[in-house]
Amino acid sequence: MDAAIRGNDVIFVLKTIGVPSACRQNEDPRFVEAFKCDELERYIENNPECTLFESLRDEEAYSIVRIFMDVDLDACLDEIDYLTAIQDFIIEVSNCVARFAFTECGAIHENVIKSMRSNFSLTKSTNRDKTSFHIIFLDTYTTMDTLIAMKRTLLELSRSSENPLTRSIDTAVYRRKTTLRVVGTRKNPNCDTIHVMQPPHDNIEDYLFTYVDMNNNSYYFSLQQRLEDLVPDKLWEPGFISFEDAIKRVSKIFINSIINFNDLDENNFTTVPLVIDYVTPCALCKKRSHKHPHQLSLENGAIRIYKTGNPHSCKVKIVPLDGNKLFNIAQRILDTNSVLLTERGDHIVWINNSWKFNSEEPLITKLILSIRHQLPKEYSSELLCPRKRKTVEANIRDMLVDSVETDTYPDKLPFKNGVLDLVDGMFYSGDDAKKYTCTVSTGFKFDDTKFVEDSPEMEELMNIINDIQPLTDENKKNRELYEKTLSSCLCGATKGCLTFFFGETATGKSTTKRLLKSAIGDLFVETGQTILTDVLDKGPNPFIANMHLKRSVFCSELPDFACSGSKKIRSDNIKKLTEPCVIGRPCFSNKINNRNHATIIIDTNYKPVFDRIDNALMRRIAVVRFRTHFSQPSGREAAENNDAYDKVKLLDEGLDGKIQNNRYRFAFLYLLVKWYRKYHVPIMKLYPTPEEIPDFAFYLKIGTLLVSSSVKHIPLMTDLSKKGYILYDNVVTLPLTTFQQKISKYFNSRLFGHDIESFINRHKKFANVSDEYLQYIFIEDISSP
């Protein structure tokens, strides 16, 4: 700092309130005078009834001042209350000033607090009916511009504080050409109350805010930008209502006419004082008139009407300009791509690092609150009102027109805290995961510290898996299908076949189910047998509706199909359950289309029986056999003599509890990912095993025996006629009786009689009432000479 401004001992004073600007500028000795401190003190002694008001001589040339405050409380505090209040007052205002100085001036927070709390002077009013004083912080210097900029901060402190002294700070003194009554002088000649000095400060310079005497203990700060630079080039923002409408609202508030109304425009309305024609009392405070004019300011998206001079002498009025503010808030939230509309008409919300449905709980409202602090200050305060939040939420819903396709990342596994790439093992979180729009997840957080191969849990898990599906040459094909099926549960795409887990009781099917449920969490759903045995239509079907976007569906405990009255598995249902879209809606909902990403596993102790068998069905069925029995010690001997089991193991009574406590969650998940990369990269492959279904034996074999007749077989008719074939309607046909004779050479009628009859009924045709035929040719009849 320049040495010229480190000191000022010439005190410029006004001799009365309301000195005309011209007299002040010309330094008319009738109204103004300049003193050295000792001269000022003698002048007051010689003129005890004088009225002196300290002010800066020329703010443009020199505006260094001490931080000062004027406190005026219309109540008298007793000594104890006063001491407590003044102590809290010093702490509050020093903290407030230090925060402002740090934020706006780049000052050192601790240094400001230290300089303010270590050295200050207090005056005391001789008026016994009130508590009034001036406080001068002797070693804390700033500029008048800085004090003016600090006015709002101190005003907010004054309004929010519970301290009566803090609430009584007069912020009106922070203005251009401000004045402060000199200690020991009167406010006017008729007023006999004055402010007196208090120990330990007995020098008049300690009570003057324009006196400057900087030393090593002093601290100075000022605005990093001038007030003029802080004013934006254009005050009126596009989101506001029109300026004309806003000024009309201001005019209606005053009731009395504004004489210079037509002089106001978008660029000057904050600097031009309002000239009011007080025909009637002030509409704000009901006083007959005001000496100082009202003025307008623009704050937080609203016009603020306040009175210059002492602002507490009239009410402050706010005129909101938020014609489209709530709409703008909704638009800003939409711009973050944190709320989307799915193709099913659902709203999904990006919150806490994952996409979630806005269904059971109001997640859009939670999102609005969570990003409130990321919005500009003028918007964030609006969201504290529940009614306005609801309006913003409604705006967001109305503005979302274009739907987005979700869950199109089959090789990504979503968690509560991010997304796991199944191919390369990368885990994406935060904004990196946001681009993978997945509406369902495992429901738990991914923990990379547990997602490792070498762990005690992995060792225990491998022993469990190897017991359920042994790694033997005889079981190699079965084990491979077991691994393929379970790892396909990670994939978010439609699977081409259903898998039956077939085996006697206590062979590890339910253990596998619980391990899978633990590993993929909410992506697993268990359903009933009705999805296999009942007609699937567009009616209410919560079992089908719950399959939407799930990656594994487990259907347990099929009935014993040998029992009378039990329903067979519907072939049509199997076909529908391998389609990308499954029809079925929840109760009280019209959403009937469910995206089918599930690996459907059917846990059964009985061989499956179908109502109808064809090639389409056989291409959609795979079977994993379970032949290791887990037995109690008492039943082990009987189990070892049962041909249904290859091995018998002792049952681990504590295993179920460990699985329920998710001990093997990340170990099994690691294993599933490993199998996924082994079998399903780059293409997911899940093949049927129709040869494992006894009921398919006839259809698998007959497909190797017969071909449909066609025109290319007509030239062979000479040889075929000798073998019982006839030509009917230009098609080679085989009479029914002849077909039955030929087919009996390949199939035992006692074992396959029902299948033969079913095949005939499905394919036979009628020449007339009594003659029946089939349009099939035995392969051996056209291949043999």
Curated annotation (Swiss-Prot):
Changing residue 557 to Q: More than 90% loss of ATPase activity. Residues 477-639 form the SF3 helicase domain. ATP binds at residues 503-510. One of its GO terms (molecular function) is DNA-directed RNA polymerase activity. InterPro entries: DNA_primase/NTPase_C, Helicase_SF3_DNA-vir, P-loop_NTPase, Phage/plasmid_primase_P4_C, Viral_Helicase-Primase_Cplx. GO terms for cellular component: host cell cytoplasm. The active site is at 170. Changing residue 605 to D: More than 90% loss of ATPase activity. It holds the Pfam family D5_N. Keywords: ATP-binding, Helicase, Host cytoplasm, Hydrolase, Nucleotide-binding. Its EC number is 3.6.4.-. It is found in: Host cytoplasm. The keyword Nucleotide-binding applies. Changing residue 509 to A: About 30% loss of ATP binding, and more than 90% loss of ATPase activity. Residues 342-469 are annotated as: Primase. Transmembrane segments: none annotated. Belongs to the orthopoxvirus OPG117 family. Homomultimer; hexamer. Interacts with OPG148. Multifunctional protein required for genome uncoating and replication. Major viral uncoating protein that is required for the release of the viral genome from incoming viral cores containing the viral DNA genome. Possesses an ATPase activity that is required for hexamerization and uncoating. This is Uncoating factor OPG117. It comes from Vaccinia virus (strain Western Reserve). The gene is OPG117.
